[in-house]
Amino acid sequence: MTRRPGQAGSAAGRAGLIAISASVALTFAVAVAGPSVMEPVLPGRSGQPPWALDAHLSPYLAVALTAGSLAAGTLGLVLVVRAMRSGWSVPARAIVVAGLLAAAALTLVPPFGSSDQLSYAAYGRMLVTGHNPYITTPAQLAALGDPVARAVQDWFTTPSVYGPLATAIQGLASLVGGTSARLTVFVLGLVNLAAFGAIALLLHRMMRGDQTRQLRAALLWTANPLLLMLVVAGAHVDGQAAFFGVAAVAVMFGPWGGRRPSVPAWPRCAAAGVLVGLGFAVKVSDVLVGLGLAIALAIWLRPAWRRLVPLLAALGAGFAAAAGAALAIGGSAMLRQLSRESDMVSIGSPWRAIRAVIHLVVTGTAATDIVKSGATALAVVLAVLLIRGLPGVLPGRDRDPGGGAGPGIAGAGYPAAGASVVFALVLAWLFAWPYVLPWYDALAWALLPLVPLAPAAGTGVVEGICWLLLARTAALGFGYLPARQTDAALPPGLSWLQPVLRHGVTPVILAGTTVMLVVLMVRSRPRRRSATPKDAAAWDSSTMKPQAPGRTPRGPVGPQRCPGAEDTPPEASEAPARGAGR
């Protein structure tokens, strides 16, 4: 009997969900087992959350379970994404609920993978005890006898590198936790859970009216087993920064679904700017979201420059208000810390080997300066290629080797194009920058569901990007097993992990995915399409709203809409003493 394609897709989809479930179960097992080579000790009173056993996992078992979770999660994502391309589907709401329940369960058990959460607790403790987190180190606070600071392992001699909003959240958690590092970490975990869940619900709302896109968003973010491990179970602040980035896109380009949206008015631009500024006050990398929003406006409003200027001014004013307040609070000490961090080159980055070669010719900090310049140039090149190559970004152009129009362009129009520009800048930075850690990819994963996929026929550009991002995140996850150094000595039988994976395999895979991204975007060959009543609707440049068919535009013809189609889918080398991950 010949098997119908839908049957094969259903089998792959079911297998993918089983693999994802197994990955989450293994992640939970490592966390609930208690302190191990993967999980630092959380000092605190007995019975305080987060709760765990004291199973004393051997280093071999802890690493094996974590590696198994990464492998199962990666396989599960591959299967479900491919199954969706074959027409497989399940209720998106069920996946959202399952993902949120998994995230909640992982919040109730201790974080693992790195010891960054202990540094967060110490920075909050500094704030509530009257110390400046940007000039005070956990070691200095520990010398005063503070029990929370004494619990810090990695980054023991490093002041905070996070924005004032992140520090304020850490301070509030410290007020609740008091002298208990354990309870403080738990409160921070609740904040991270809220940010993760808010992104999940935002994406689901933004994709309303399209079950396929809602399912894709749920699988790529809410039920993504790699993010559940690296961001939620890892308790990293990157989820908070990602929330403000997604919220800015949602506000700027709304309403999503329902009636056809117009180009945003200045209040939306100002509100989006404020959200970007708040994200900047968590992690400075969120400034890329604001830059992407500005570029998106410039691309689509070139024929109406009189409208463009006030919108850009509103966006900039909103950002300046929030980011300016953050800089005023953080002061020059925060800027110095950010400057020092920008000089770091992760061992897992291919730039580490490049810098070593440059060191043979130059001395001092010149090699690092050359690497930073090269990374900046690469990021610009990647951003340009991505903006030119993603579907629906440039008005009147398609992008897909299969020759079709990108789906969701007609269904989402300007919002999809704007989100694609923001995604392009974030992805370019991630693939180009010398300082890389697995959880940094969270912002790209959060924005990816907003980018329309290419048609089912042929290999879509966005689908190819999805595979490259998955390969990159998985490689970093394996490379940082564990992302700890202090109090996490590996036994002789596991001593090969860092020199083989982190120093060797991970940089090679990251370099390979970057090269493949360049090739993919160069081969996308953007081509201009002519507008016809059947496949496009002209935009009136005076109002920047869709024209009714047959109506003569009052100004130059702007962006055109295409027919809808299927919407499927460190350790730092420069880290101060005891630094392993950030």
Language-model-detected regions and their locations in the chain:
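Transmembrane helical bundles and short interhelical boundary loops of multi-pass, membrane-embedded
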Residues: 2-3, 11-66, 299-301, 311-315, ...
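Transmembrane signal-anchor helices characteristic of membrane glycosylation enzymes that use polyprenol
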Residues: 19-38, 68-115, 131, 317-329, ...
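Intramembrane catalytic core of multi-pass membrane enzymes that act on lipidic substrates
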Residues: 88-189
